[in-house]
């Protein structure tokens, strides 16, 4: 059993920010949480309610929205208190549960993005065999992997304390005794978490986007040339627009993902090698940038998918409670 020195003083370590600053932070973070919850809840309701949206691809989007909604519901509120107060008030056991759930849901959201990019790859680059390859069974396997792998990794690592092997004393002095609660990794576990939760799925997304962009560009150029030869220049715009739109949608999803999560994961993997010099406040701030990814995902749908905008109107105006509204045509 370890003892915390000067525990009488440390036990009251909390935020040095003024009441006004803390109130502003609570308001800002509450807005982020509310945006995450409402946006993803609308995606969940829309895909669940409208029969036209019951496609394999949309069930993958539905699953990711559930992950992001749970992140906003189960993780972000407690992270908000930790961030603003600079202290963890909810006990050691709940800290482990919160950290495990945080890692699991954040990783699951990222894995869903990787699988969505694979789905888009086949849709754009192999359209003739798309429905045969990306069927309901394939989507079910993707969803199963996206949930189970992060769950086993996160809960196994945190509750077995595999992330603390070799750095137990450092964790006790720098986190536990200061009433902190945030993911703390040794060099080995940090690299493993970085590879599993960020590098591998991120590399898949970048590779797939690279392939989609150049294949779609080549297809559009070929169609352009063929139509020009028969004097149908104007008709080349429709397929080009469709392919370009698919590439742009995935490109924005990948860009938002990298912008949100890159800073956090690079600090996380480098910190053990730098002697844990990165301040917890900075880590916490970067973690919130990562959370923003879950709030931005529904905004990408709203911008690029007309069906989402139509479904949003029907949900907001209560039209989903009308008879046979589930059979409404959201697209042709």
From Swiss-Prot:
GO terms for cellular component: endomembrane system; endoplasmic reticulum membrane; plasma membrane. InterPro entries: GPCR_Rhodpsn, GPCR_Rhodpsn_7TM, TAAR, TAAR1, TAAR_fam. Residues 1-24, 80-97, 160-187, 271-287 are extracellular. Widely distributed, but in low abundance, throughout the brain. Highest levels detected in the olfactory bulb, nucleus accumbens/olfactory tubercle, prefrontal cortex and other cortical regions, midbrain regions consisting of substantia nigra and ventral tegmentum, cerebellum, and pons/medulla. Among peripheral tissues, highest level observed in the liver, less expression in kidney, gastrointestinal tract, spleen, pancreas, and heart. SMART domains: 7TM_GPCR_Srsx. It is found in: Endomembrane system; Endoplasmic reticulum membrane; Cell membrane. GO terms for biological process: adenylate cyclase-activating G protein-coupled receptor signaling pathway; adenylate cyclase-inhibiting G protein-coupled receptor signaling pathway; G protein-coupled receptor signaling pathway; phospholipase C-activating G protein-coupled receptor signaling pathway; positive regulation of cAMP/PKA signal transduction. The keyword Endoplasmic reticulum applies. The chain crosses the membrane at residues 25-45, 59-79, 98-118, 139-159, 188-208, 250-270, 288-308. Coiled coil: none annotated. Keywords: Cell membrane, Disulfide bond, Endoplasmic reticulum, G-protein coupled receptor, Glycoprotein, Membrane, Receptor, Transducer, Transmembrane, Transmembrane helix. Intracellular G-protein coupled receptor for trace amines, which recognizes endogenous amine-containing metabolites such as beta-phenylethylamine (beta-PEA), 3-iodothyronamine (T1AM), isoamylamine (IAA), cadaverine (CAD), cyclohexylamine (CHA), p-tyramine (p-TYR), trimethylamine (TMA), octopamine and tryptamine. Also functions as a receptor for various drugs and psychoactive substances, such as amphetamine and methamphetamine. Unresponsive to classical biogenic amines, such as epinephrine and histamine and only partially activated by dopamine and serotonin. This is Trace amine-associated receptor 1. It comes from Rattus norvegicus (Rat). The gene is Taar1.
């Amino acid at each position: 059993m370890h003892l915390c020195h000067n525990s009488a003083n440390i036990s009251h370590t909390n935020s040095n920010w003024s009441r006004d600053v803390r109130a502003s932070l609570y308001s800002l973070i509450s807005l982020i949480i509310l945006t995450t919850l409402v946006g993803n809840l609308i995606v969940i309701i829309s895909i669940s309610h409208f029969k036209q949206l019951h496609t394999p691809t949309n069930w993958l989007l539905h699953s990711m929205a559930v992950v992001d909604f749970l992140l906003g519901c189960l993780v972000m509120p407690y992270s908000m208190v930790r961030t603003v107060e600079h202290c963890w008030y909810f006990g050691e056991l709940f800290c482990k549960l919160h950290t495990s759930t945080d890692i699991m849901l954040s990783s699951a959201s990222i894995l869903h993005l990787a699988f969505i990019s694979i789905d888009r790859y086949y849709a754009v680059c192999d359209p003739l065999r798309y429905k045969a390859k990306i069927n309901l069974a394939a989507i079910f396997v993707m969803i199963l992997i996206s949930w189970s792998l992060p769950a086993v990794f996160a809960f196994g690592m945190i509750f077995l304390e595999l992330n603390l092997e070799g750095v137990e004393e450092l964790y006790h002095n720098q986190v536990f005794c200061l009433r902190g609660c945030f993911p703390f990794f040794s060099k080995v576990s940090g690299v493993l978490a970085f590879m599993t939760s960020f590098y591998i799925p991120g590399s898949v997304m970048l590779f797939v986007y690279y392939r989609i962009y150049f294949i779609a560009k080549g297809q559009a150029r070929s169609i352009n040339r063929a139509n020009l030869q028969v004097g149908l220049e104007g008709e080349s715009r429709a397929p080009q627009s469709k392919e370009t739109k698919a590439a742009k949608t995935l490109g924005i999803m990948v860009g938002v993902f990298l912008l949100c999560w890159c800073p956090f994961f690079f600090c996380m993997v480098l910190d053990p090698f730098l002697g844990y010099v990165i301040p917890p406040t900075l880590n916490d701030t970067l973690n919130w940038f990562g959370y923003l990814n879950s709030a931005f995902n529904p905004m990408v749908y709203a911008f690029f998918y007309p069906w989402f905008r139509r479904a949003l109107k029907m949900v907001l105006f209560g039209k989903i409670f009308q008879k046979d509204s589930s059979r409404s045509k959201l697209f042709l």
